Amino acid sequence: MISKVRKTVLGGLLAAGAFAASAPAFAGKTLDAIKQRGQVVCGVNTGLAGFSQADSNGNWSGLDVDICRAIAAAVLGDGNKVKWVPLNAQQRFSALQSGEIDILSRNTTWTLTRDASLGMFFTGVTYYDGQGFMVPSKGKVKSAKQLKGATVCVQSGTTTEKNLTDFSRANNLGIKPVVFEKVEAATGAYFAGRCQAYTTDASGLASVRNKEAKNPADHIILPELISKEPLGPSVRRGDDEWFTIVKWVVYGLIEAEEYGITQANVLAEKAKSQDPVVMRILGTSEDTGKLLGLDRDWMVNAIKTTGNYGEIFERNAGPTSPLGLPRGVNNLWNKGGIMYAPPVR
């Protein structure tokens, strides 16, 4: 028989659990600061075509840029309310740790060391990549295993530098790294002939070849990938609410693609769709925004600004973009890829 005291305690716990399940999120310090200043401060690459790059008028574009725009739209209702902070590889983590930026969306690889020791949380993967090599097409090298004793240009302070050393040792290649602090210096040295190869993420190789080579056909990207490079945005530790918001905006973009919600049809789907999942994503049946401390239309605003994940990929990096990259593993889980989002519910 349950005592009166135990009944009271049990009843209180059940009530607390029910309240926790339905209560709105309390705004964290990052969200409060963003709303007060009216901008999301986003750390991006200094210039990587397809991911984050400014034109001559200071207009930013790219996959990483669109992720920040979607977050700003979800949080503030306007994807243009973003302050861009260009950062090199050495600056990016200290800028996040110090509070200079709210989010780092800068082709950064999710690793154990970074996750556990740099005071940051990765919020998901927005591009599954792998490290490769670029060499002159007129040379004899057609495989990374043929780089024995070669000089290879690489940027310091990156997983790329460490992977190069590991690959060389594992295959007894005796590769000679030529290390540069700035990526522009590394690529410039390669195109000037100071190195026999250049290495970075495969997406970065395509970007550099497209943007910097006088004739892109003069350079080939070797077929091997020597590492896994899951790239995605990250936030500071210590603000669970902000971490949850950024994570679920990314998931929402992936979920929107899976259910056919696009930049062009999002408002029509909101008005007429009877699909329970679509209705939850767009806030017509459930106010999921309340759980995040956001407006009911948080995902409507995000999708209206950038489109879904597939649209973001195709526009910036896909086969019809200047980079011309295949969707590959970055396709949805039900289309041969590994992009997968937990349900928005």
Question: Model regions: which residues?
Answer:
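Bacterial N-terminal signal peptides that target proteins for export
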Residues: 2-12
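N-terminal signal peptide c-region/cleavage motif recognized by signal peptidases
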Residues: 22-23
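Extracytoplasmic small-molecule ligand-binding "clamshell" domains
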Residues: 27-105, 284, 288, 292-299, ...
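Sec-exported extracytoplasmic/periplasmic mature domains
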Residues: 35-39, 72-77, 97-101, 109, ...
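Bilobed "Venus flytrap"/periplasmic-binding protein-like clamshell domains
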Residues: 41-50, 60-75, 109, 129-185, ...
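Extended ligand-binding regions for polar small-molecule ligands
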Residues: 66-69, 73-75, 138-141, 145, ...
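Acidic, polar ligand-binding/catalytic clefts
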Residues: 69, 73, 77, 81-146, ...
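Short helix-initiation/N-cap motifs at beta->coil->alpha
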Residues: 82-94, 177-192
